[in-house]
Amino acid sequence: MADCSALESLIEMGFSPSRAEKALSATGNQGIEPAMDWLVEHEDDPDIKEPSVVIPEDSGTDTTDTTDTQAMDTSAERLPLTEEEKEKQTKRMMELIAQKQKEREEREKRERIEQEKQRRKHGQELSAIKQRMQEQEMQKAAEDRRREKQEERLARERVREKIARDKADRARKFGGAGSEPISPPAETSVPATAPSPSSPVQEPPTKKEYDQCRIQVRLLDGSALSQTFRAREQLAAVRLYVELNWPGGPPEPFSLLTSFPRRVFTEEDMEKPLQELGLVPTAVLIVAKK
């Protein structure tokens, strides 16, 4: 089978397809140059696919006319090319080959340039699409961050409002206990007894009354809060004080206890005065997780 590129080149030079195929076939498909040499050498050969001239028979033609016709055909035949003519023909064909090669290279160059333009254009379009997607993602991320910050701010406000409400409720509930007037301790009346002449008079010891007490509360992190309370204030007032003054607020529900003697105060104890719980005049309370 003839080489397609060589066949097309020969056809572009002006050779008929049949002669080009015959030249390539005769030279064993070794390329365009051997085929061109063959075409130059066989330029006078009739084309294998060109119809031969058929002279119609005419019974009225005599021998003399036939002889004249053959002589004319013989004289019309072209003489073989000389070496100089062959060189010129080869040179012309080589120039045609060079021209066709140059045209083909220029065409391929234009095609490569166009392909490069299309590639760059496609790359620019992809870059633009990628940039738009990145900008959209960044914008969405910024909107998400703004929304999260807004939600966090609202959540903090709700927590602060709840803490404020709880503090106010506890202050209303337990704050009145400390406003009770402190009545002086009742004097215990000792019945007068006649002194015995045989024994000295002994007065019973009087129990000292305290109207205030100093409470120290140790928090979970080891820090401490100290405050003075009225002896008749309820233990709930101490718990409220701890909740209000705990740095950052208490992390979780807690209970109060004493280490010696060990005692964990219950919710019922919160309603009892400090004096009744034995926390007067001073006491150390420890915060423990519930």
Swiss-Prot record:
GO molecular function: K48-linked polyubiquitin modification-dependent protein binding
CDD domains assigned: UBA_UBXN1, UBX_UBXN1
Coiled-coil regions, chain positions: 81-171
Keyword NAD among record annotations: no
Protein's cellular compartments: Cytoplasm
Natural source organism: Xenopus laevis
GO CC term, one of those recorded: nucleus
InterPro entries: UBA, UBA-like_sf, UBA_UBXN1, Ubiquitin-like_domsf, UBX_dom
Regions of compositional bias (Basic and acidic residues) in chain numbering: 80-117, 132-172
Major location category of this protein: cytoplasm
Protein name, entry field: UBX domain-containing protein 1-B
Bias (Low complexity): 185-201
Domain of life: Eukaryota
Pfam families in alphabetical order: UBA_7, UBX
